[in-house]
């Protein structure tokens, strides 16, 4: 895509109705994590003509007036285009987990392609749909959130509006699809134009994946993800302000920037990136041609892709370390920064930025285990007796680089435990605040002296008792007693006003880390002889009996009084005759339970 042409005044009235409206860049995600972020991606279009579209293109042509064809690398006849990118598993001595992952896909197209493209058609109604797979797994059909699809002309080299360049951007939250970090990620069936665009506006299409992950061996980083859409051209560019962090108080300030954009050209210079007002360069990205149709990482071109073209013909994505020698761009104790894409010649369309800066922040970790009266660890045990006395032990410490304050630890007892706590033991500096019998919530407050940076483990413990009243055992899987401890806290130096939250894990692993999950034990009880019982008075012609929700199946039968036998298979049973009614409730993986009315 080339520079905007100047318009004659008498044409302005007819053109202004199609001028693109920018979407302001706003934070999508902001969190302080001990970890980092990864950005990869690929184009879905490649130079065709006499060469295979799956062959890497390393030439210097721009994306106009050439034949653009779909790449299709997945060896799957059911998809019409595809490309992939590899992510290497980060090396660490600690456990890692994905905190957040987003997939973006974007294209520059023309109305002429929407009207005339065939096999397959370019369908606006399907812009928000792609296929996404991890490794050798099956494709997931994604429906994205629209970031930009105004159907406006964003650039033109002539007066034919059907050939004016338009653009779309969509994203999807794919966090729950990623079980690991390292994998080959493939995107397919992305709506994109193909063929030869002869007006000079050009076609472009590609995708990028951003992964934010926790790794307790790494420093605390405040990571902010932004998306929006801007037509950047000479004299017209956005300033993206970032706040909600505080850099380290001394020593080097380390930051990383991520981005994705359409229409940066390898051969058209002048598109640049400023950080806090200073033009920057990065490995693989010249200061005077920062957006240059490439995928890069901290060391330069990222070719762990298929196809592995060095020229992606109008699609850019990457991540780089901020060149901050002597903290000249980002100072100690800084709390704001500004990212500014701009140009003196080419026009291009950034739609994603990420800001990742090492900060000072506390990090509370909590381990929760279960013990019997003989002080045996019975976490995950499957033979706990009805009415057994047990003890929860909660350990906590601060592994961050900032002191913590205002730490409040909260436990909510499940209904399968008696509504009381006993024998509460806390270290000096921890206060048992309250136990609310209505909400079954127990709270502890912790003095900041116990949670200074890199503090030692502290332990809270209290007694609980497994319920011994059959009417306390009504819900699905009630005999699988699982719950977590949660905590809220603030940093002493970290300025985040919303503070921090965390949940417990069942066992501290490497680096005092773990995956947040409930602590579990199972009560071994035959519920045939322990049914929930309730008396319902038949005052009118009918009475409604309602069993507990959440089971897979229900089987009602009348066991005494009048017409006995099976009565229904729904959760709710309407009866018109006095007697005894029993419902058998089943759920896969859980004990069979009963109710009697």
Q: Which functions belong to the PLM regions below?
A:
Residues 20-363, 395:
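Disulfide-rich extracellular domains of secreted proteins
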Residues 342-377, 421, 471-532, 593:
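Extracellular/luminal low-complexity Ser/Thr/Pro-rich, glycosylation-prone repeat/linker regions
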Residues 20, 522-597:
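Proline- and Ser/Thr-rich low-complexity, intrinsically disordered segments
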Residues 380-410:
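Short beta-strand elements of extracellular/lumenal beta-sandwich folds
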Residues 369-373, 405-455, 501:
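A surface/secretory-pathway sequence property marking extracellular, secreted
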Residues 170, 316-326, 445-490:
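Low-complexity, intrinsically disordered segments enriched in Ser/Thr together with acidic residues
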Residues 215, 263, 398-402, 408, ...:
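Short, acidic/polar linear motifs in exposed loop/turn regions
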Residues 1-22, 530, 539:
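Bacterial Sec-dependent N-terminal signal peptides
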């Amino acid at each position: 895509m080339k520079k905007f042409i100047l318009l004659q005044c008498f044409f302005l009235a007819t053109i202004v109705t199609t001028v693109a409206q920018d979407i302001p860049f706003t934070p999508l995600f902001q969190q302080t994590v001990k970890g980092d972020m990864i950005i990869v991606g690929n184009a879905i279009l490649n130079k065709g003509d006499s060469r295979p579209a799956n062959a890497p293109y390393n030439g210097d042509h721009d994306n106009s007036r050439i034949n653009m064809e779909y790449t299709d690398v997945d060896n799957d006849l059911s998809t019409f285009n595809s490309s992939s990118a590899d992510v290497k598993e980060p090396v660490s001595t600690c456990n890692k987990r994905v905190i957040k992952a987003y997939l973006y896909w974007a294209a520059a197209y023309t109305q002429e392609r929407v009207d005339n493209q065939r096999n397959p058609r370019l369908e606006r109604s399907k812009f928000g749909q792609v296929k996404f797979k991890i490794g050798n797994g099956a494709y997931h059909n994604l429906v994205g959130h629209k970031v930009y699809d105004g159907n406006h002309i964003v650039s033109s080299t002539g007066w034919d509006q059907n050939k004016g360049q338009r653009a779309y951007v969509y994203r999807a939250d794919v966090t729950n699809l990623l079980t690991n970090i390292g994998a080959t990620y493939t995107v397919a069936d992305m709506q994109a134009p193909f063929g030869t665009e002869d007006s000079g506006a050009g076609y472009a299409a590609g995708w990028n994946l951003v992964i934010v992950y926790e790794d307790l061996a790494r420093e605390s980083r405040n990571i902010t993800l932004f998306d929006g859409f801007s037509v950047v051209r000479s004299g017209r560019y956005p300033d993206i302000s970032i706040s909600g962090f505080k850099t380290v108080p001394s020593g080097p300030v380390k930051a990383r920037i991520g981005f994705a954009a359409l229409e940066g050209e390898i051969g058209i210079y002048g598109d640049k990136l400023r950080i806090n007002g200073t033009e920057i360069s990065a490995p693989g990205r010249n200061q005077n041609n920062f957006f240059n149709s490439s995928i890069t990482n901290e060391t330069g071109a990222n070719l762990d892709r298929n196809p592995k073209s060095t020229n992606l013909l109008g699609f850019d994505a990457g991540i780089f370390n901020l060149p901050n020698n002597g903290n000249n761009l980002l100072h100690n104790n800084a709390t704001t920064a500004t990212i500014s894409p701009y140009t003196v010649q080419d026009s291009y369309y950034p739609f994603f930025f990420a800001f990742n800066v090492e900060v000072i922040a506390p990090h509370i970790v909590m381990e929760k285990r279960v013990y019997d009266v003989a002080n045996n660890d019975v976490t995950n045990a499957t033979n706990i007796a009805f009415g057994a006395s047990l003890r929860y032990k909660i350990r906590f410490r601060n592994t961050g680089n900032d002191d913590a304050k205002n730490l409040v630890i909260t436990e909510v007892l499940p209904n399968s435990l008696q509504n009381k706590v006993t024998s509460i033991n806390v270290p000096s500096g921890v206060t048992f605040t309250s136990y609310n019998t209505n909400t079954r919530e127990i709270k502890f407050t912790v003095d900041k002296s116990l949670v200074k940076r890199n503090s030692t483990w502290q332990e809270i413990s209290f007694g609980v008792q497994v319920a011994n009243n059959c009417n306390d055992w009504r819900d699905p899987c009630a005999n699988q007693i699982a719950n977590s401890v949660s905590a809220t806290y603030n940093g002493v130096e970290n300025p985040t006003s919303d503070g921090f939250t965390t949940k417990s894990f069942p066992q501290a692993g490497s680096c005092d880390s773990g995956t947040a999950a409930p602590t579990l034990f199972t009560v071994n009880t035959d519920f045939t002889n322990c049914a929930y019982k309730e008396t319902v008075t038949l005052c009118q012609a009918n009475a409604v009996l309602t069993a507990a929700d959440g089971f897979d199946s229900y089987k009602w039968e009348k066991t005494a009084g009048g017409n006995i036998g099976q009565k229904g298979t729904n959760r709710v049973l309407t009866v018109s005759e006095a007697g005894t009614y029993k419902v058998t409730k089943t759920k896969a993986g859980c004990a069979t339970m009963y109710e009697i009315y």
